[in-house]
Each structure stands twice: as structure tokens, then as C-alpha cells.
Amino acid sequence: MSEKNAYAKSGVDVEAGYEVVERIKKHVARTERAGVMGALGGFGGMFDLSKTGVKEPVLVSGTDGVGTKLMLAIKYDKHDTIGQDCVAMCVNDIIAAGAEPLYFLDYIATGKNNPVKLEEVVSGVAEGCVQAGAALIGGETAEMPGMYGQDDYDLAGFAVGVAEKSQIIDGSKVKEGDILLGLASSGIHSNGYSLVRRVFADYTGKELLPELEGKQLKDVLLEPTRIYVKAALPLIKEELVKGIGHITGGGFIENIPRMFADDLAAEIDEDKVPVLPIFKALEKYGDIKHEEMFEIFNMGVGLMLAVSPENVNRVKELLDEPVYEIGRIIKKADASVVIK
């Protein structure tokens, strides 16, 4: 028995792995940017930091996955957007520190290599990288029979960006009286899906719920996470933003306080929050308490900005989209987030 046959009998298809690499090359090529060194397939991805033109560079990194949203991608057999979710979860975190994404690496683990399916996943990763301006410089596809079912896979990523040292955003400049501006989310994004799956466990995904304005449920649930890089970078370059919050797991309550010092709080005008239809549906069909929704979901705001009052108009001018003035920074009395 040859070594190749022995490995195949253990459930690992080396040839399928080679096919995956060949299939994804054209998607990786879409993401190339200045600074990338070497070619796909080396032992390590390389990037020339001097090509960024940043005078005092500070590297900012972030890593994340997609959580159980993957289970819906598998259930509905739709794999071409889940990669964008993975990129978004990483690059939105580093943009919150004032960093421009430079490059990205992905990790896919599966029970059985399916080259067509994995190409779809990586095509979504590449699309996310294009939207973020980040190069996909490497990754790993691990076939692990026995660890995962044949149709199952997991996806995670790692992003590195660069910030000018003087432009790092850490919330230390946020002060009482600053205005909180919200940028719309595209949907649920990539958090809260254990609850989402429970609420809609008995649904096929083809339902046209009245709250969803003619869209099939599965399309709304798998709407890819918005990437905020191109919206936020011009604001960072002009130093118009004092704090940025990526509204992920924990919703408003957990994420907004990460934007400012412990002696401050956020006062939110709930009437100004652009709540998306899917959140109204989740609250209704899941019988979820209204206040708990703000502890779990983004509620229609995926990125929060803390801005000086005198800079609000300039920020709105630079952003070619609706901007929601949903709150302000106050002195902390008790709670870190007060929703009125």
C-alpha cells in the first residue's frame, strides 16, 4: 500500500487540496496591493511596510470568526458571502483603532475537502479583502476527518493594518458633549446567531415574513456583514473622529463603552436608531424582551463614531450615506449606556 493510498483511506484527499489551491489563485489575485511580496504558496506571507508611506507606523491586528452563522450557510448551501463576514469581523475591529487594513490571512477547517464549495468560501474572503483594501497573502485549508462532519467547515481570519502613531484612536480624546453618529448595518452581521437559529429553527428559509419587505428569510439571515473601511478611513485621515465602536456581540451595551473612558457614558435616543426589519422580526417571533435586543444585536447600527460637535457637519459631508445622530457622551452616573 502506498503512502498516498494510506492517507486517502484515512479520509484525507491530497489531490482535492491541490485543486482548492489552484481554484483560489484567481480570487487571491484580485486582492493584490502595493507592499505585497512573494507569491501564494510560500511558507509565510510577506508585506513591505515601507510601501505604505506611513511615517510612524503602528501595526494593529485583529482575529475573528463567523460563529454559528456558518451553520446557516451550510443549511442553505450558500457559501459565497460567508467569507466577507469573516473579513469584516476582523477589519472593522482594526479600523476602530484608526488602522488601515494591509493584509489578511484565512483559516478553513473541514471534514472533507470540496473544491467547489471551498472556492466559493474563498471568493467571499477575496471580495471582503477588495472592499477593505487588504491583500489576501496567505491562509490554511485543513482537512480533518473525524473532527468535522463531511459537509461541515469552520472559518476564521486574521487581519493586520497600520496606523500613523499620531492618529491612533483609543477613546482617550472622547469627552462629555461629544456626539455619537451611527452608520447603518447591512443586517444582523455575524453575532447573535445561536439565538437567531433558535428563533427560526423550524423555518425553511424560503418564508416571506411580512416584516422583511418581500425578501426571503434565508437571504436576510445570510446578508454579509458590512465593511466600514472605505467610509471610515477619510474621517481618520482628517482626524475628525475621537472614538469608533464596532457593534458586534453584546450589542450597544457591551461595545459602546469600549469607545471611551470609564468615567463617561453614552446617552442614546432610541427614536434615532434606524432599527432594521429583521430585528423587529426577531423580537416578535423570538419573544425577546425589547431591552435585551440592545444587549445582543447591532439593531441597525454597525459602526458608532464619537465626534466633536463642530465636526459633525464635515463628517456627514464626507460620508456618502445617511448618518444617524443617535446620542451624545455624558458624565457617567450609573450605567455606561443609557437608552432613552
UniProtKB/Swiss-Prot annotation:
GO terms for biological process: 'de novo' IMP biosynthetic process; adenine biosynthetic process. The keyword Ligase applies. Pathway: Purine metabolism; IMP biosynthesis via de novo pathway; 5-amino-1-(5-phospho-D-ribosyl)imidazole from N(2)-formyl-N(1)-(5-phospho-D-ribosyl)glycinamide: step 2/2. Disulfide bonds: none annotated. GO terms for molecular function: ATP binding; phosphoribosylamine-glycine ligase activity; phosphoribosylformylglycinamidine cyclo-ligase activity. Its EC number is 6.3.3.1. It comes from the Bacteria. NCBIfam families: purM. HAMAP family: AIRS. Belongs to the AIR synthase family. This is Phosphoribosylformylglycinamidine cyclo-ligase. It comes from Streptococcus pyogenes serotype M1.
